[in-house]
Amino acid sequence: MLGGTDIMATPQGGEPGGLEEPKKMTREDWRKKKELEEQRKLGNAPAEVDEEGKDINPHIPQYISSVPWYVDPSKRPTLKHQRPQDEKQKYFSQMDEWYKKGVKEGSITTKYRQGACENCGSLTHKKKDCFERPRRVGARFTGVSIAPDEYEQPQLMLDYDGKRDRWNGYNPEEHTRIVEEHSKVDLAKRTLKAQKLQEELASGKLSEQVSSPRHQWGEDEQNSQTEKDRNSEDEDEDKYADDIDMPGQNFDSKRRITVRNLRIREDTAKYLRNLNLNSAYYDPKTRAMRGNPYADAGKTPEEVSYAGDNFVRYTGDTISMAQTQLFAWEAYEKGSDVHLQADPTKLEVLAQSFKVKKEDFEHEQKKSILEKYGGQEHLNIPPVELLLAQTEDYVEYSRHGTVIKGQEKAVAKSKYEEDILINNHTCIWGSYWKDGRWGYKCCHSFVKMSYCTGEAGKDINNTDICEEDLMPTEEEMTKPKTLVEIHQEKLKDKKKKKKHRKSGDSDSDNDEKKKKDKLKKALNAEEARLKQVEEMMQLDERKRGYNSVYESREPTEEEMEAYRMKRLRPDDPMASFLGK
């Protein structure tokens, strides 16, 4: 029974051109197929091969190895659809491809070439794309005045690394020119040095130098010829050292090495000014120290050479930027659509125009006030420093023009009038002092603006009878009172209170009477107004008068009270009984 059961399966092979219906597969064939797959997974059977001859991993699931019907109608297992497609791959330029440089000019073609432009003879375009004036007889037939090929640069497709390669397009052969120049310089130096040695040997100077005692002890003579030669060699070396000289580096021309100096300045680093960990914070990323490193030591910023970087925050355009931001906020609150970051140009133009208008308005306002009230002469005065002699400098010069004495500021005068004597006084007020009081020294008077009494005033003011003696003493002030005196004072206080009450009662009665009279008048006026309103409502609208003569003022308290008393209240249940 098992062998007779059929299963629908897809054939392993088929015609690549057409779509075939799935053929029936018996259960025996299905079992053989599964056994073959197991053998392939175990490695006992060779792996399946695709159309390119590549092995298919037997462990790959069927839904991956099977080709969709819209890709390959043959239904043959393959992994081609899982690999990158050639038509979708990006091809980049090779390392040897680069832009053309140093194109030779002046090469002229004298013969027409096959495939060139029939009009001008250039190989880079055709006749329909030629920009030259159409010739009566083209270059194809005449072979005269053949135009050169156009200069076209290749379109390079560079990948991520190719775009960032700093040596891309570099030709190492260009460096040979520099190497040749240095080799020629070295050869010339050696030749020159050999000639000098031969000249010294011929003249005998070299033998004298060797036999000198300074040379025997290993010392060179000062200003010798060899020293000059060495100096000249150093100058030649410095010629090339200048090209390599950079800030922060030392170039040794003898050994041709470069020594990097991490710090070439002689000042103290910020982080070394105060080694306390709780002192000003040093940010190593920005190399900034905003706080004062000497703040813990109790030194003011004026006493130290470095007080932090906070002063930089208020230099440049910082203050003007803050003023512009404040103007933007104020303008936005008043309805102007401006913003410092969104539209800075608009804000700057608006701020400048506002500043000009404000200055013009203040000038016009000042001008109008001066025209109306006057006082321009009080504004045209010299500075206060000149009025009070603040700028007077006394300087003495010698015959030779040097300063002997001077450069001292003039003493500032007091704002009060000085040395002015009044009322026959010979001394000013404040020239005499006694018992905590100021007075005149000429008459010992303690009364300001008084008339001078001379020596007689001195005798009177210096007598033992003083105002203090006439004043009652503390003992008299604190003297105990008798019972009769205390009783009399109480009676006086009671009488005063009774009088105050009577006067207060009479005043309150008068006020109440006045209020009642005012309220009565207001009620009568309200009744008259209501009657007038009823009469006006009975008339036709066209016969009513105008309200142009109506007096508008704030109603008094009595009028408001009368209005409330006479007002109709329809919600009041007792309103119907008011008219009865």
From Swiss-Prot:
GO terms for biological process: mRNA splicing, via spliceosome; RNA splicing. A zinc finger (CCHC-type) spans 115-132. It comes from the Eukaryota. Residues 493-502 have a biased composition (Basic residues). Residues 20-41, 523-544, 551-572 have a biased composition (Basic and acidic residues). Keywords: Cytoplasm, Metal-binding, mRNA processing, mRNA splicing, Nucleus, Spliceosome, Zinc, Zinc-finger. One of its GO terms (cellular component) is spliceosomal complex. Pfam families: Slu7 (PF11708). It is found in: Nucleus; Nucleus speckle; Cytoplasm. Residues 232-245 have a biased composition (Acidic residues). Residues 1-59, 200-252, 488-580 are annotated as: Disordered. Coiled coil: none annotated. GO terms for molecular function: pre-mRNA 3'-splice site binding; zinc ion binding. Required for pre-mRNA splicing as component of the spliceosome. Participates in the second catalytic step of pre-mRNA splicing, when the free hydroxyl group of exon I attacks the 3'-splice site to generate spliced mRNA and the excised lariat intron. Required for holding exon 1 properly in the spliceosome and for correct AG identification when more than one possible AG exists in 3'-splicing site region. May be involved in the activation of proximal AG. Probably also involved in alternative splicing regulation. Belongs to the SLU7 family. Component of pre-catalytic, catalytic and post-catalytic spliceosomes. Associates with the spliceosome prior to recognition of the 3'-splice site for step II, probably during catalysis of step I. This is Pre-mRNA-splicing factor SLU7. It comes from Xenopus laevis (African clawed frog).
